Amino acid sequence: MSNVAVVGTQWGDEGKGKIVDLYTEKADIVARFQGGNNAGHTLVVKGRKTILHLIPSGILHDNKTCVIGNGVVFDPLVFLQEIEELQQGNLLPPHTKLFISERAHLIMPYHRSIDQAREARTSGKKIGTTGRGIGPAYEDKVARTGIRVGDLYEEDLFRDKLRQNLEEKNFLLTNYYKDKPLDVEEIATQYLSYGQKIKPYVADTSLILDFEIKQGKKILFEGAQGSHLDVDHGTYPYVTSSNTVSANASCGSGIGPNTISTVVGICKAYTTRVGEGPFPTELKDDIGNHMQQVGQEFGATTGRKRRCGWLDMVLVRQAVRVSGISALAITKLDVLSGLDKLKICVGYESASGQFTYAAPASMRVLSECQPVFEELDGWKENILHAREMNDLPVNAKKYLKRLEELAEAKIVLVSVGAGREETIVLEDPFHK
């Protein structure tokens, strides 16, 4: 058995889409296990950019099975739009199967309304939500008032749940947020129609995955966001509303944890963050601008500029520990080309002058921490055509070696450009 989970080691946007796309060639099945359409995976195939927010990145490969697991919050409109875009671009392979868990919770219009109204009202203390309704959908799931994909096929049950939910949500929208109420019948008609359109894809995906595992098939579990956006282990409250670490690959897919043999952590060669929250190594100078412009650091979902800074190995080490990462894939190494000096954060110094290798849980304490850097020499060479480690400049290899030492995890892949072919593959995680 050789099943692989891929998770981000930072605040998302690490380049997971490209890596998942590459690893899909070795896998039989690709499964999304958490999040929703608040994350965007950017893929470049044959010079064409494709951004997927909900459908697993493996959809571009033929003879694969793609699964949207029970841990995902599912927006049927976004799903149907992505299917249509893939069909129009002639990007849907003829023999690839796609399934949606009947247990996945639906993102409803009132989730989006509340998400946006809440963020607009929160003056000075914004979380930086995408406004896609992800958080409110997870809130309803935990509160046991959520509506699941499978409920769309029991019309009386669906209407009853919707009516009860809207009674509460409309009261909140009109009386607290001073927003417009939503119409029960309009939503019911809309979502029941969605239900019929997505029906061919809906299944008990836990059973499908279990069957395929017993047949010896290889599964790639695709995480969204990054470890430090995890609702438990991230920079709370500046986090997403789900568990983004590897342990949720099991829970969010409906299979046992012993079925996952390898966890690959995706680590950008520098650090970025979208939205609010502490960022100890953030650069607001020419180097930060270089990273932002050369790396094209704009959110795939929101289009917002990403904040950029030096690589923070305190955060990466924590991600390695929490997710049990044994293999690292380094992305966007090419963005650092041309910089005279490179810095790596190896620890923090607190406001009281104490040195620590670990990130504090308190956001106040973290925001007061100063990064402690190691400095390395950079390189001038263009590395886009590197296909083996020996093709890289000496200083690039030294940089990677130091990252490996600090993370205490082996580098198995280095991405030197956006294209599939612009990659140095050192090990196949499916053959461990």
Which residue ranges define each predicted feature?
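Non-transmembrane, aqueous-exposed alpha-helical and coiled segments at domain scale
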Residues: 1-432
